Amino acid sequence: MSRVIRSILIILGSVALYTKYYLSFQNGFIDLLSTMGSQGSLAGLQSGLRSHYTGLDPLDRFLKACNVFFWPIFHGTSPALSLYAIAFAGSMIPMWLILLMHTCVNSSIVEIVMINALAGLLVQGIGPGVIMCVLLAMRNTSMKEFAVTGIPAVSILGPNDLPLSLVVCYILPLALSSLPAPASISVPSKQLFIAIWQGWPLYIALAVGIAHSLRNHYRRNRPQQLFRHAYAFALACSIISHVGLLSISFLSVSPQSPFLSLHSADLHPRSLLIPRLPWQEVKITSLESGVLRFLHWDYSISSTGTLLWCYDVYWKDRMRGRGWIAFFSLSSRLATMSLAFGPCSVALALYWAALSNNLMKSENARKR
């Protein structure tokens, strides 16, 4: 099944390029972003776009474009967009953790830091819809290597190091970027926080490397213990954000909904949860609608690709040799769980089931 999954991932990456970038040129979204950038304006503000961040002109231009794109998400001009972005942000944690855990096979701590920093920056800069599918298509879905190595490179880390690095390097910058401006912070400061948040994959990779060096003389932990805390944390973030999105969206349909007066049409499940099909494209007239459409496809494709890849990992490890009945039975259960708890939550659970099984085999083999 691996060849089929790899082909599907490549197709999904191509679809992401088409829906996110090609159609964004066709429907006027890229032109709208460029116009706002050249005019120095932000969604909901006529001016105030910050131009200087680092002193490096290419990097400053990139961060300026990031602020134009992300401003309506963090500024809250569209409740539906901000709500969907929260669910997307929650799903990024299990996606990143899956990449990190799989990179740990036969890798030194330097390789782990460099690979995840580079991969994470590509995911943040281009989008997980394209990069996650490409990265996963390049990775082997076999767990045999885990049963041999037992992930020695990162076993020196403490069990709370990974969750703490996620909180400090990813969630904290997100929270600071979400502070209301100008009520709590100034508009330039909010833009600076948004710019700082763009580097979260690099910060996490560096935090892992620093934690490893500080614990160089510590007793090694069991790999299951190390990743169990990170797994539980990532799963909780993903489930809470997804269930929150579903709850508010479906509550908006009720006549007694507290969200009825708050853009209830935008919060309707049909508008908020289902991306507009490519042949239903319309001209983008507002930045908020363009960003939401962009995130729709980015989230849908990246989460689908991650789920399919983890499904293949789990099937190879736990279900090899089963027939079509087992395949369709498992697929139907996973589809239901994905709708209820989020596809990235289910993907992480599948991956952890296969990983923990092989780590336990590795530990038992070393004890003999």
Swiss-Prot record:
This protein's record includes keyword Transmembrane helix: yes
Enzyme type, top EC level: isomerase
EC number in record: 5.4.99.-
Keyword annotations from UniProtKB, A to Z: Glycoprotein, Isomerase, Membrane, Transmembrane, Transmembrane helix
Principal location listed in the UniProt entry: membrane
Glycosylation sites: 106, 140
Membrane topology per record: Multi-pass membrane protein
Subcellular location: Membrane
Signal peptide start and end residues: none
Gene Ontology MF: a single term: isomerase activity
Membrane-crossing segments per the record: 10-30, 81-101, 118-138, 192-212, 233-253, 334-354
GO cellular component, one term: membrane
Pathway stated in the Swiss-Prot or TrEMBL entry: Secondary metabolite biosynthesis
Function of the molecule: Part of the gene cluster that mediates the biosynthesis of the indole diterpenes penitrems. The geranylgeranyl diphosphate (GGPP) synthase ptmG catalyzes the first step in penitrem biosynthesis via conversion of farnesyl pyrophosphate and isopentyl pyrophosphate into geranylgeranyl pyrophosphate (GGPP). Condensation of indole-3-glycerol phosphate with GGPP by the prenyl transferase ptmC then forms 3-geranylgeranylindole (3-GGI). Epoxidation by the FAD-dependent monooxygenase ptmM leads to a epoxidized-GGI that is substrate of the terpene cyclase ptmB for cyclization to yield paspaline.
Protein family membership: Belongs to the membrane-bound ascI terpene cyclase family.
Name this polypeptide is given: Terpene cyclase ptmA
Source species of the chain: Penicillium ochrochloron
